[in-house]
Amino acid sequence: MDAMSLSFERTQSVAIIGGGPGGYEAALAAAQLGAEVTLVERAGVGGSAVITDVVPSKSLIATADAAVAISEASDLGVQLFAKSDSGKPLKPEVAINLAAVNKRLLSLARQQSDDMRAQLVEAGVRLIAGHGRLDGSHGVVVSTGPDGTDFDRIEADTLVVSVGASPRELPAAQPDGERILTWTQLYDMKALPAHLIVVGSGVTGAEFASAYMNLGAAVTLISSRDQVLPGEDKDAAAVIEKVFKRGGMTVLSKSRAEKVERSGDGVVVTLSDGREVAGSHCLMAVGSVPNTAGIGLEEAGVQLTESGHIQVNRVARTSVPHIYAAGDCTTFVPLASVASMQGRMAVFHALGDTVIPLERSRITANIF
């Protein structure tokens, strides 16, 4: 009886790879339940969702909306004027300082990341900066040195993998960080692009195309489908496409980009039918790839799909009972809110708390 009592009193340990919404929420929940928690993050707490994706992109969209509101203020009877040297009123133009905009966006993202880190520290979570990978079914090895030669090893009762995903890169359209860009590289631009070509009309492509159009850039959106936002409600997508065209955006439907090349100070996108579209910059928004390669998942017995996503059930558990996964690296819906719920659910389930399994039909999403 004494031995049994002691086994129940032993503090459970949880190791988490990835500090995005899923890993962050898993760490907080595990700490609140009294577990010994270690979180490994290579880029900063909050992951890409906070640092390069959701927070900066939605802040950019809000900035673009503000620019439109100012431009259309006269329609509401609000008029902005400046006086010339002669005393006559001059109607000012809306000017976008993209360098200042991007500096603010990244500052907001970093502030939120720092706040999240502070909350984890306050909760007693041990944080390790580095690249983590599984070492067997209960271990995590972290490369902490700049050259990947220094290592730290963690043993834990429960492992949570929340490594996220990265922008998909096509062989014939390799991003260079200057003219051919992924959505994580947009915030390095110092000036508004003269003509932004967006390849991919899913949620990411449509949101950025709309934002840069509202900021004043010429935008061409290349969609391989019949209309923008494939997979969403067709009537709603049709309305959004009309709004895009009314705002001056060029939408090329049923057009597939074969390659993207630099051309002097611009880019040329070659379509599958031989047409060429020239612009100043190109944003590649053709999906994402889970960051699951080379981190020891298959060696630990974790089942992956052909696309590299981690197969999880409705409580975020993988094919290995004590290994869980959350976020964009899993087969569930790639939303920050879902990742957060998966992270909490994973540790609740692992540590014996009550959970209500996720239901896809009850997941709501929003497009900005």
Named regions from a protein language model:
Residues 2-12, 28-35, 40-192, 225-229, ...:
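Glycine-rich flavin
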Residues 6-20, 192-202:
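Beta1/beta-strand and adjacent pyrophosphate-binding region of the FAD-binding site
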Residues 13-38, 206-213:
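N-terminal Rossmann-like FAD-binding beta1-loop-alpha1 element of flavoenzymes
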Residues 15-17, 132, 153-164, 198-199, ...:
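Short hydrophobic core segments
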Residues 18-23, 164, 200-205, 287, ...:
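Conserved phosphate-binding and hydrolysis motifs of nucleotide-dependent enzymes
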Residues 54, 161-218, 222, 298-300, ...:
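Glycine-rich dinucleotide-binding loop and its adjacent helix/turn
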Residues 131-133, 202, 256:
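Conserved acidic residues
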Residues 177-192, 276, 281-357:
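FAD-site-proximal beta/loop scaffold in flavoenzymes
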